[in-house]
């Protein structure tokens, strides 16, 4: 039996990865992390989405220690969440949470070890990575090697969205006939608003632009997505 663990936030990217994983693996588990994020509504959204999609198990892990160590506008009420125009001016935006993906992927791999899963799946993306250094392909591959050595098991870190832009990510959800579900039921917004979000933060801006691009040229973008992902 093929098993996978999805690092799951309930956002567009991780939900798209989860939908694909359900189509590719016999058994899928989700891991969601409570790190004291301001947009805590994502935890409830993640529970609801994973239940609706029928995963085998969904773990919510308390990693609030990260909140004590990592200064970010996603974990501190006194640091404002920038709108998309402000985010574009900074190489590393204030929404970056230092060490987040290091911790998440490592803990997900430990859980994968426990349930004998062959893969940990994450929705990080270098094409639209918003300036986050821990969303880069180089980082994920390096950590994958270190973790596999550390637990003496070849658990594979999969990044299905790594080279897709946001429009192509929408195409991937449409390929699996879940575009409307992802559009209405996920939470990507840094201000914690489900669906279309606040419309002003960087995450909402990226998501909305990608959707508009896809809806304006669905056949072209679907073809490009299939070529990148080797889907038929």
Curated annotation (Swiss-Prot):
It comes from the Bacteria. Gene3D superfamilies: HUPs. Zn(2+) binds at residues 189, 198, 201, 204. Its cofactor is Zn(2+). It is an enzyme of class 6 (ligase). Pathway: Purine metabolism; 7-cyano-7-deazaguanine biosynthesis. Transmembrane segments: none annotated. It catalyses: 7-carboxy-7-deazaguanine + NH4(+) + ATP = 7-cyano-7-deazaguanine + ADP + phosphate + H2O + H(+). Binds 1 zinc ion per subunit. This is 7-cyano-7-deazaguanine synthase. The gene is queC.
């Amino acid at each position: 039996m093929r098993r996978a663990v999805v690092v799951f936030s309930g956002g567009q990217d991780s939900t798209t990865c989860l939908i694909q994983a359900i189509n590719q693996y016999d058994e899928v588990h989700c891991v969601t992390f409570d790190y004291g994020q301001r947009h805590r509504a994502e935890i409830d959204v993640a529970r609801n989405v994973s239940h609706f999609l029928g995963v085998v198990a969904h773990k919510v892990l308390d990693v609030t220690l990260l909140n004590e160590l990592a200064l970010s506008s996603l974990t501190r009420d006194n640091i404002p969440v920038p709108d998309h125009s402000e985010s574009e001016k900074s190489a590393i935006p204030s929404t970056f949470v230092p060490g987040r993906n290091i911790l998440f992927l490592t803990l997900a791999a430990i859980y994968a070890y426990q349930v004998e899963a062959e893969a940990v799946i994450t929705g990080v993306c270098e094409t639209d990575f918003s300036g986050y250094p821990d969303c880069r392909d180089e980082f994920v591959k390096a950590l994958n090697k270190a973790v596999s050595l550390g637990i003496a098991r070849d658990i594979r870190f999969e990044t299905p969205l790594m080279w897709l832009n946001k429009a192509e990510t929408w195409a991937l959800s449409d390929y699996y006939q879940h575009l409307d579900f992802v559009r209405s039921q996920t939470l990507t917004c840094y201000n914690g608003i489900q669906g279309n979000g606040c419309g002003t933060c960087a995450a909402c801006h990226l998501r909305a632009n990608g959707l508009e691009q896809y809806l304006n040229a669905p056949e072209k973008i679907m073809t490009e997505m299939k070529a990148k992902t080797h889907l038929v």
